[in-house]
Design a protein with these regions (language model features):
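Exposed substrate/partner-binding surface patches
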Residues: 1-229
């Protein structure tokens, strides 16, 4: 699902915006076959959501005034948990539709370039990790949420500066923000995120992992032998 960021304070507002109906009337009437032009309502309704929900935040879009593509760095908040029941048809609302955040894909940079990395919570009760190229490091909730909302930030030292300072604090625009979110339905969490054992891996992947392990062992031995001389 592609959700608007511009003009939206948070993920919930983006969902309400997505299902908002549009009136087709006046010069914009709907052409109904056999009935000609008719006043109508145009909109989207959700009958259900998948076990794993991928939400693309529209950080890149075409600016009519500038006649060019731009990156939207506006602040847009997203939660660790969201109840999507209000956005479903009435018939589906007897089920629980709470979703938990388990993945954040981030772009750091501008329209013309930048860097991509991911923040992932691999298990229901695990910590968060940052996957940045070949580096995997633990991540805090601040790194997952606040650091990727976009908008502006107070520069380092701005909050704790000396009381006698009189110059105004200038906020800095953030160019690092989330562009895709991955939520997992809470009631299906154990099934979606169940542990993967050796039997679940395809042969080609098991062989590749073993080859990489052997190569790492060879390089380790070579380094140890070099130290002997």
């Amino acid at each position: 699902i592609q959700l608007n960021v511009k003009g939206m304070l948070n993920l919930e507002q983006s969902f309400w915006n997505y299902i908002q109906t549009e009136m087709l009337e006046g010069d914009n009437k709907y052409h109904a076959e056999g009935y000609g032009l008719q006043d109508a309502e145009k909109g989207v309704v959700f009958e259900k959501f998948p076990p794993v929900l991928h939400l693309q935040l529209k950080r890149f879009e075409y600016d009519l005034e500038k006649d060019m593509m731009v990156k939207i760095n506006d602040r847009h908040e997203f939660p660790l948990s969201i109840d999507l029941k209000p956005f479903l048809i009435q018939e589906a609302q007897h089920e629980p539709w709470v979703y938990k955040l388990h993945g954040v894909l981030v772009h750091s940079g501008d329209l013309h370039g930048g860097h991509y990395f991911a923040l992932i919570k691999p298990e229901p009760d695990s910590n968060w990790f940052k996957f940045d190229d070949d580096r995997v490091t633990p991540a805090t909730l601040k790194e997952v949420l606040e650091d990727n909302f976009g908008g502006e930030m107070v520069p380092p030292g701005g909050i704790n500066r000396h009381p006698s300072a009189t110059a105004p604090i200038r906020a800095m625009k953030r160019f690092t923000n989330a562009y895709m979110l991955v939520y997992v339905r809470e009631s299906l969490m154990d099934e979606v995120l169940k542990p993967i054992g050796p039997a679940d891996l395809p042969d080609y992947l098991s062989e590749r992992i073993e080859d990489e392990r052997i190569q790492m062992e060879i390089r380790r031995r070579e380094r140890e032998e070099q130290h002997l001389y």
